[in-house]
């Protein structure tokens, strides 16, 4: 028998907790036998004294097992269950293409996603822009769509990882969100509860990233790779660039349009293509669907070019209640803003740098993101045709096109865009889309 206060005392004194102590405490978080004050105290003790990798693995698996863990064995799937998770960014629409692409190559992708908060957009909010699409289907429908389409992107159900819900809300209120140990357990407990064989992790770096520095992003990537593999799920983390908007746009309906255009080959933003391919190829290799990165990329290009990935996206949308002809006719279903107008720079030159976070917040200001959980969204608003770094800027090439519902909102967003993008006489150095891979064998 353990006492919560003795577990807190041990961690306060910078001692390592045993697997059994961690399991006891997580059970207490779940069944409310541990108080909010005790959870806050342990969170603060971990924040200051950290956890070993063994402690992180124990915390992650205990939180994963605090609710339902999905099991796909009964469906008789003829391929691996694989997924991707991103720490979040601006214009990060990768999931919408990557899920169908991986499914078209023989994987099964049960992607449980979140809503946006602050400057980062949420994958679920993008799907809410599609009329009829159920982001919270019954577990029977979720399993049916995963089996038949190969991919289903839905929201977290109430019976998955209840320990994380309670722990996270307390961390949020007590300034202990920024602990790498706790971030690792929070992210992975949710992902691993989906019953995955393999996971590719997208850890963002730069001015639109969740972690403040490259070093912090790298530390998180290493922690996630070590803990996920330690918990039995093959995982690689990629450090990818978020020093500019990833897609050409930011905003829910706008990003859905860009994702469909990417899948059908109408338009593929080169940066978005590179990061999507890197993550998706890693999923195929980890899942045993491709021999190596080059083999995986060949397979992925094939399913993009022959239309199979686009077809699977359509199958997922209709399977979850959306329009059957969405891929062909998205224009008649996606909402449009009443004001669609470019914003220009005050001088000519090159797009030199971008405070990506501020562009994400401009979308929030327009009504396309949340200031607090539960806020209603306007799916039509946002930014499109966002300039790329290094691009020439003059009176004919705008910084971006703003989609707004009022003149006042347009003006406020225009000020934010001008303030977030620096135009200079010199061109910036080109940065890679993918900085590095963190694989299990590298640790």
UniProtKB/Swiss-Prot annotation:
Transferase as UniProt keyword: yes
One of the protein's GO biological processes: pyrimidine nucleobase metabolic process
Any one GO MF annotation of this record: thymidine phosphorylase activity
Alphabetized Gene3D superfamilies for the sequence: Nucleoside phosphorylase/phosphoribosyltransferase catalytic domain, Pyrimidine nucleoside phosphorylase-like, C-terminal domain, Transferase, Pyrimidine Nucleoside Phosphorylase, Chain C
First-level EC class: transferase
GO cellular component, one term: cytosol
Enzyme Commission (EC) number: 2.4.2.4
InterPro entries in alphabetical order: Glycosyl_Trfase_fam3, Glycosyl_Trfase_fam3_N_dom, Glycosyl_Trfase_fam3_N_dom_sf, Nuc_phospho_transferase, PYNP-like_C_sf, PYNP_C, Pyrmidine_PPas_bac/euk, Pyrmidine_PPase_CS
Pathway, per record: Pyrimidine metabolism; dTMP biosynthesis via salvage pathway; dTMP from thymine: step 1/2
Catalytic function, reaction form: thymidine + phosphate = 2-deoxy-alpha-D-ribose 1-phosphate + thymine
Domain of life according to the entry: Bacteria
Alphabetized UniProt keyword annotations: Glycosyltransferase, Transferase
NCBIfam families named among the record's database cross-references: PRK05820.1, T_phosphoryl, Y_phosphoryl
Protein name, UniProt field: Thymidine phosphorylase
UniProt organism field: Shewanella amazonensis (strain ATCC BAA-1098 / SB2B)
């Amino acid at each position: 028998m353990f006492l919560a206060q003795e577990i807190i005392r041990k961690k306060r004194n910078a001692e390592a907790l045993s697997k059994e102590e961690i399991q006891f405490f997580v059970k207490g978080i779940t069944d409310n036998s541990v108080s909010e004050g005790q959870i806050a105290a342990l969170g603060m003790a971990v924040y200051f004294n950290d956890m070993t990798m063994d402690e992180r693995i124990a915390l992650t698996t205990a939180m994963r097992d605090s609710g339902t863990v999905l099991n796909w064995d009964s469906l008789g799937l003829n391929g691996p269950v694989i997924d991707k998770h991103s720490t979040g960014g601006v214009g990060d629409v990768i999931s919408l293409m990557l899920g169908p692409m991986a499914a078209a190559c023989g994987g099964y992708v049960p992607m449980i996603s979140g809503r946006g908060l602050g400057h980062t957009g949420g994958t679920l909010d993008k799907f809410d822009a599609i009329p009829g699409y159920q982001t919270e289907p019954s577990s029977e429908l979720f399993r049916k769509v995963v089996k038949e389409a190969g991919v289903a992107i839905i929201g977290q159900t109430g019976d998955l990882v209840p320990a994380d819900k309670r722990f996270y809300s307390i961390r949020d209120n007590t300034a202990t969100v920024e602990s790498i140990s706790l971030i690792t357990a929070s992210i992975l407990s949710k992902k691993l509860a989906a019953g995955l064989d393999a996971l590719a992790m997208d850890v963002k770096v730069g001015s639109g990233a969740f972690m403040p520095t490259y070093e912090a992003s790298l530390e998180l990537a290493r922690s996630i790779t070590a803990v996920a593999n330690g918990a039995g799920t093959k995982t690689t983390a990629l450090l990818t660039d978020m020093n500019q908007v990833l897609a050409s746009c930011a905003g829910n309906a706008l990003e859905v349009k860009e994702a469909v255009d990417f899948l059908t080959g109408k338009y593929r933003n080169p940066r978005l293509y590179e990061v999507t391919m890197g993550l998706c190829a890693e999923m195929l290799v980890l899942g045993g669907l491709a021999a190596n990165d080059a083999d995986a990329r060949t397979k992925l290009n094939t399913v993009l070019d022959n239309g199979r990935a686009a077809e699977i996206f359509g199958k997922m949308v209709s399977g979850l209640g959306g329009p059957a002809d969405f891929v062909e006719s998205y224009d008649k279903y996606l909402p449009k803003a009443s004001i669609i107008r470019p914003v220009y720079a005050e001088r000519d030159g090159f797009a030199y740098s971008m405070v990506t976070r501020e562009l994400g917040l401009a979308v929030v200001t327009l009504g396309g993101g949340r200031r607090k959980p539960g806020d209603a969204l306007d799916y039509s608003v946002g930014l499109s045709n966002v300039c790329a770094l290094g691009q020439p800027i003059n009176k004919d090439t705008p910084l971006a096109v703003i989609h707004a519902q009022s003149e006042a909102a347009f003006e406020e967003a225009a000020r934010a865009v001008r303030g977030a993008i620096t135009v200079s006489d010199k061109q910036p150095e080109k940065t890679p889309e993918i900085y590095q891979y963190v694989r299990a064998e590298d640790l």
